[in-house]
Amino acid sequence: MQNVVIRAIERLDFRTKEAYKTLRTNLSFAGKNVKVISLTSCTPNEGKTSVSFQLCLSLAESGKQTILVDADLRKSVLRGRYKANREKYGLSHYLSGQVELDDACCRTNVNNFDIIFAGPVPPNPSELLGGDAFRNMLEVLRMKYDYVIVDTPPLGSVIDAAIVGAICDGTVIVVESGAISYKFVQNVKEQLNKVGCRILGCVLNKVNTKKNPYYGKYYGHYYGNYYGNGQDGTEEAQEDLTPDAGSKTDGTAAETKTAVPGQNTG
């Protein structure tokens, strides 16, 4: 296993950190067998990679052994954004049979947090992500880690996210507030449904709390609103904490709206 140092970890304010704790809690309500989770978005620059990274940090801080798999093989921004020193091998090296899985894994300077970086851009990203090697890799990581978070490309651009989502336990869609139309989000949702992907919920990102006072007004307020989808479930009260990441689980917990001001692009 390689060792890498992440030099640019964002300092989050209280509300932002609490929002990720809420997202972390909501995912736990999705079920104990939901361990391999992919994140996608409609378009680039909605904050998908930032949400993936900060979710992993939150999980790691809670004591969960967590690994972030950078499956954006076409245009990864992870290593550059967080100023990690260059890894020797990445996901594309492993999927193309050049190295063993352990060689592609990186132990970071954050306790409980490992990363598999994307590696060099391959000529056939979709084929690699849809192959047996990627599926088998996720099963191996499932046995080793409490959570496997997979950062995938925007689904509005390429089909890779649907390919990955179909073999994960569930998918979270990151949507930039005020930038993406309802119809566009529904189109992405339809693509995921077609491949049998379980959609765990949606993170509403980059919410302007001044223009959207709703998210700030109910900060710290507990509420529950069960929205069953044909599955058995009980109403749970979740905490409405912040104004930039909204999340809700797949019919197993209450609808929750949270927010985290100032998320980066990616």
Can you say where each PLM-predicted feature lies in the sequence?
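P-loop NTP-binding module
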Residues: 1-266
